[in-house]
């Protein structure tokens, strides 16, 4: 079982990171285990047999990974791809590639016991990641962009929170500080049938959908009553994405 991570384009091929999920232990479902790197062809156009054809799937690309590095990523002008993961769901971590190619060597950003960070090629231990978080407030599902000379991180409040936070830093690997509430998500969905929901998750940022510099987010939800996901009026609308545009988002730091 795989959970989709982020992706990039290299040599006209789409590279997608797939996070392995282990459900063999009923007491610890959805446990992260390893990363698969799949490569797809971008030859032709959507609808062509060649377009998005699977070229290769390396199911053992990173068997050591248990922290979801690459769940989201940022391709920086410094030549690296920054790969974000998490420890304990709410401590953000970062690794980076040597080049703009996910198959190039990875390094992990780790703090020593004195709080000094450095890049290392060995996969970090649990003790290392416990002291290596890169943000100042608990959050999940980070997305990083750059505007001007500043890197901004957007992330969801903990426990499936219905608020989105914004952080800033002068580096893509943090520390991300100055946490502020960016916006709140509604308690009701624009759908038929039951409009309240249980969990809000998979808050994704879509820079390619921006028209005039605004932020575009999508969210997923599920029903309070599990059966309502399948057999009630509007059931299909629980899991489908809902989209939100956030204008003048930089103004939050003018307050």
Annotated model-derived regions:
Residues 1-8, 69-73, 140-143, 201-207:
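Beta-propeller and closely related beta-sheet repeat lectin domains
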Residues 9-64, 76-140, 145-193, 209-214, ...:
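Beta-rich carbohydrate-recognition and catalytic domains
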